[in-house]
Protein backbone atom coordinates (compact mmCIF):
# COMPACT_ATOMS: atom_id res chain seq x y z
CA UNK A 1 0.00 0.00 0.00
CA UNK A 2 1.36 3.39 -0.95
CA UNK A 3 1.96 5.78 1.93
CA UNK A 4 0.81 9.36 2.26
CA UNK A 5 4.36 10.63 1.79
CA UNK A 6 4.90 8.49 -1.30
CA UNK A 7 1.71 9.73 -2.92
CA UNK A 8 2.46 13.34 -2.00
CA UNK A 9 5.82 13.05 -3.74
CA UNK A 10 3.94 12.32 -6.98
CA UNK A 11 1.67 15.37 -6.77
CA UNK A 12 1.74 18.68 -8.62
CA UNK A 13 -0.22 20.77 -6.09
CA UNK A 14 -2.28 22.85 -8.49
CA UNK A 15 -4.02 26.22 -8.60
CA UNK A 16 -4.94 27.36 -12.11
CA UNK A 17 -8.15 29.31 -11.57
CA UNK A 18 -7.91 32.57 -13.54
CA UNK A 19 -8.93 34.58 -10.47
CA UNK A 20 -6.20 33.14 -8.23
CA UNK A 21 -4.63 35.82 -6.05
CA UNK A 22 -1.03 36.24 -4.98
CA UNK A 23 -1.98 35.28 -1.43
CA UNK A 24 -3.71 32.11 -2.64
CA UNK A 25 -0.62 31.12 -4.59
CA UNK A 26 1.57 31.82 -1.57
CA UNK A 27 -0.71 29.60 0.52
CA UNK A 28 -0.48 26.89 -2.14
CA UNK A 29 3.30 26.97 -1.83
CA UNK A 30 3.14 26.80 1.97
CA UNK A 31 0.80 23.83 1.74
CA UNK A 32 3.11 22.10 -0.72
CA UNK A 33 5.93 22.33 1.79
CA UNK A 34 3.74 21.07 4.60
CA UNK A 35 2.29 18.19 2.59
CA UNK A 36 5.52 17.22 0.84
CA UNK A 37 4.27 17.50 -2.73
CA UNK A 38 6.60 17.30 -5.70
CA UNK A 39 5.71 20.74 -7.02
CA UNK A 40 3.18 23.49 -7.27
CA UNK A 41 1.57 24.19 -10.65
CA UNK A 42 0.41 27.76 -11.23
CA UNK A 43 -0.38 30.13 -14.08
CA UNK A 44 2.54 31.80 -15.91
CA UNK A 45 1.65 35.17 -14.39
CA UNK A 46 1.98 33.72 -10.87
CA UNK A 47 5.52 32.36 -10.99
CA UNK A 48 6.91 35.00 -8.64
CA UNK A 49 6.35 32.93 -5.51
CA UNK A 50 8.59 31.87 -2.65
CA UNK A 51 8.92 28.09 -2.65
CA UNK A 52 9.66 25.83 0.29
CA UNK A 53 12.91 23.89 -0.01
CA UNK A 54 12.60 20.91 -2.31
CA UNK A 55 9.35 21.98 -4.00
CA UNK A 56 9.54 22.38 -7.78
CA UNK A 57 7.79 25.11 -9.78
CA UNK A 58 5.53 24.04 -12.65
CA UNK A 59 3.37 26.11 -14.97
CA UNK A 60 1.18 25.79 -18.05
CA UNK A 61 1.50 26.86 -21.67
CA UNK A 62 -1.16 27.47 -24.31
CA UNK A 63 -3.63 26.92 -21.51
CA UNK A 64 -6.36 25.82 -21.53
CA UNK A 65 -7.38 25.70 -25.22
CA UNK A 66 -4.10 24.79 -26.90
CA UNK A 67 -5.27 26.72 -29.95
CA UNK A 68 -2.54 29.37 -29.79
CA UNK A 69 0.02 29.57 -32.61
CA UNK A 70 3.12 27.51 -31.91
CA UNK A 71 5.26 30.64 -31.91
CA UNK A 72 3.16 32.13 -29.12
CA UNK A 73 3.40 28.96 -27.06
CA UNK A 74 7.16 28.93 -27.53
CA UNK A 75 7.54 32.50 -26.30
CA UNK A 76 5.30 31.78 -23.32
CA UNK A 77 7.29 28.67 -22.41
CA UNK A 78 10.64 30.41 -22.71
CA UNK A 79 9.42 33.30 -20.57
CA UNK A 80 8.20 30.90 -17.89
CA UNK A 81 11.57 29.16 -17.77
CA UNK A 82 13.29 32.55 -17.51
CA UNK A 83 11.06 33.26 -14.51
CA UNK A 84 12.20 30.06 -12.82
CA UNK A 85 9.75 27.36 -13.94
CA UNK A 86 11.20 23.87 -13.62
CA UNK A 87 8.37 22.22 -15.56
CA UNK A 88 6.02 23.32 -18.34
CA UNK A 89 2.67 21.65 -19.03
CA UNK A 90 1.66 22.56 -22.59
CA UNK A 91 -1.67 21.89 -24.30
CA UNK A 92 -1.63 20.28 -27.73
CA UNK A 93 -3.42 21.87 -30.65
CA UNK A 94 -6.59 19.85 -30.29
CA UNK A 95 -7.97 21.05 -33.61
CA UNK A 96 -4.98 19.59 -35.44
CA UNK A 97 -5.52 16.34 -33.56
CA UNK A 98 -9.14 16.26 -34.67
CA UNK A 99 -7.97 16.89 -38.24
CA UNK A 100 -5.67 13.89 -37.96
CA UNK A 101 -2.73 16.20 -38.64
CA UNK A 102 -0.29 14.44 -36.35
CA UNK A 103 2.72 16.03 -38.03
CA UNK A 104 1.22 19.40 -37.09
CA UNK A 105 0.63 18.24 -33.52
CA UNK A 106 4.23 17.03 -33.31
CA UNK A 107 5.65 20.24 -34.76
CA UNK A 108 3.66 22.30 -32.25
CA UNK A 109 5.18 20.30 -29.40
CA UNK A 110 8.63 20.54 -30.96
CA UNK A 111 8.37 24.33 -31.00
CA UNK A 112 7.77 24.40 -27.26
CA UNK A 113 10.45 21.78 -26.61
CA UNK A 114 12.97 23.93 -28.48
CA UNK A 115 11.99 26.92 -26.35
CA UNK A 116 12.43 25.04 -23.08
CA UNK A 117 15.17 22.45 -23.56
CA UNK A 118 16.33 20.07 -20.87
CA UNK A 119 16.62 20.16 -17.91
CA UNK A 120 13.16 21.78 -18.08
CA UNK A 121 10.55 19.03 -17.87
CA UNK A 122 7.95 19.24 -20.65
CA UNK A 123 4.55 17.66 -20.13
CA UNK A 124 2.08 17.46 -23.01
CA UNK A 125 -1.63 17.74 -22.21
CA UNK A 126 -3.62 15.77 -24.77
CA UNK A 127 -7.19 16.27 -23.44
CA UNK A 128 -7.75 12.53 -23.43
CA UNK A 129 -11.48 12.80 -22.65
CA UNK A 130 -12.01 14.52 -26.00
CA UNK A 131 -10.09 11.88 -27.98
CA UNK A 132 -10.79 8.37 -29.20
CA UNK A 133 -8.46 5.57 -28.15
CA UNK A 134 -6.72 5.75 -31.52
CA UNK A 135 -6.26 9.50 -31.14
CA UNK A 136 -4.88 9.07 -27.61
CA UNK A 137 -2.26 6.66 -28.93
CA UNK A 138 -1.37 8.98 -31.82
CA UNK A 139 -1.11 12.00 -29.50
CA UNK A 140 1.19 10.12 -27.14
CA UNK A 141 3.36 9.00 -30.04
CA UNK A 142 3.60 12.57 -31.34
CA UNK A 143 4.62 13.79 -27.89
CA UNK A 144 7.31 11.14 -27.59
CA UNK A 145 8.79 11.84 -31.02
CA UNK A 146 8.78 15.58 -30.25
CA UNK A 147 10.91 15.02 -27.16
CA UNK A 148 8.39 15.45 -24.35
CA UNK A 149 9.10 14.06 -20.90
CA UNK A 150 5.48 13.35 -19.90
CA UNK A 151 2.07 12.94 -21.44
CA UNK A 152 -0.79 14.36 -19.38
CA UNK A 153 -4.49 13.61 -19.57
CA UNK A 154 -6.32 16.89 -19.16
CA UNK A 155 -6.43 20.58 -18.42
CA UNK A 156 -9.44 20.15 -16.15
CA UNK A 157 -11.19 22.89 -18.15
CA UNK A 158 -12.48 20.94 -21.18
CA UNK A 159 -16.21 20.13 -21.21
CA UNK A 160 -15.44 16.55 -22.28
CA UNK A 161 -14.08 15.88 -18.81
CA UNK A 162 -10.86 15.05 -17.02
CA UNK A 163 -8.74 12.00 -16.34
CA UNK A 164 -10.05 8.46 -16.55
CA UNK A 165 -8.46 5.21 -15.48
CA UNK A 166 -8.92 3.83 -18.99
CA UNK A 167 -7.13 6.75 -20.63
CA UNK A 168 -4.27 6.65 -18.14
CA UNK A 169 -3.82 2.92 -18.72
CA UNK A 170 -3.77 3.38 -22.50
CA UNK A 171 -1.33 6.27 -22.26
CA UNK A 172 0.97 4.25 -19.99
CA UNK A 173 0.84 1.28 -22.34
CA UNK A 174 1.68 3.54 -25.29
CA UNK A 175 4.70 5.32 -23.80
CA UNK A 176 5.96 2.50 -21.59
CA UNK A 177 8.72 3.59 -19.26
CA UNK A 178 10.09 6.06 -21.79
CA UNK A 179 7.84 8.94 -20.68
CA UNK A 180 6.00 9.77 -17.50
CA UNK A 181 2.21 9.85 -17.36
CA UNK A 182 0.40 12.60 -15.48
CA UNK A 183 -3.24 12.18 -14.54
CA UNK A 184 -5.04 15.45 -13.92
CA UNK A 185 -8.58 16.75 -13.94
CA UNK A 186 -11.37 15.69 -11.61
CA UNK A 187 -9.28 13.56 -9.24
CA UNK A 188 -10.90 14.46 -5.94
CA UNK A 189 -10.76 11.34 -3.76
CA UNK A 190 -8.06 9.08 -2.37
CA UNK A 191 -9.59 6.15 -4.20
CA UNK A 192 -9.52 7.97 -7.52
CA UNK A 193 -5.88 8.98 -7.04
CA UNK A 194 -4.83 5.44 -6.17
CA UNK A 195 -6.71 4.08 -9.18
CA UNK A 196 -4.78 6.44 -11.45
CA UNK A 197 -1.47 5.29 -9.97
CA UNK A 198 -2.51 1.65 -10.34
CA UNK A 199 -3.32 2.35 -14.01
CA UNK A 200 0.17 3.72 -14.61
CA UNK A 201 0.21 7.39 -13.62
CA UNK A 202 3.60 8.55 -12.36
CA UNK A 203 2.45 12.08 -11.53
CA UNK A 204 -0.88 13.49 -10.36
CA UNK A 205 -2.28 16.99 -10.78
CA UNK A 206 -4.45 17.74 -7.74
CA UNK A 207 -6.11 20.87 -6.43
CA UNK A 208 -7.69 19.16 -3.42
CA UNK A 209 -4.40 17.60 -2.40
CA UNK A 210 -4.91 17.71 1.35
CA UNK A 211 -8.21 15.83 1.31
CA UNK A 212 -6.81 13.19 -1.04
CA UNK A 213 -3.75 12.61 1.15
CA UNK A 214 -5.76 12.48 4.35
CA UNK A 215 -7.31 9.25 3.12
CA UNK A 216 -3.98 7.48 3.49
CA UNK A 217 -2.01 6.34 6.52
CA UNK A 218 0.98 8.52 7.24
UniProtKB/Swiss-Prot annotation:
Its main location: cytoplasm. SMART domains: DeoC. One of its GO terms (biological process) is 2-deoxyribose 1-phosphate catabolic process. Its EC number is 4.1.2.4. The gene is deoC. It is an enzyme of class 4 (lyase). It catalyses: 2-deoxy-D-ribose 5-phosphate = D-glyceraldehyde 3-phosphate + acetaldehyde. Coiled coil: none annotated. Belongs to the DeoC/FbaB aldolase family. DeoC type 1 subfamily. GO terms for cellular component: cytoplasm. Catalyzes a reversible aldol reaction between acetaldehyde and D-glyceraldehyde 3-phosphate to generate 2-deoxy-D-ribose 5-phosphate. This is Deoxyribose-phosphate aldolase. It is found in: Cytoplasm.
Amino acid sequence: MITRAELAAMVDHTLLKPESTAEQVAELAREAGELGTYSICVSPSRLDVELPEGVKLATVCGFPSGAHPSEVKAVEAADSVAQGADEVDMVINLGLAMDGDWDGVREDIEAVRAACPEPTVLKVIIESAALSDEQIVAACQAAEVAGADFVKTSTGFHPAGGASVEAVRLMAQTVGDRLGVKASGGIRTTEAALAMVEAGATRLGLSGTRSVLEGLDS
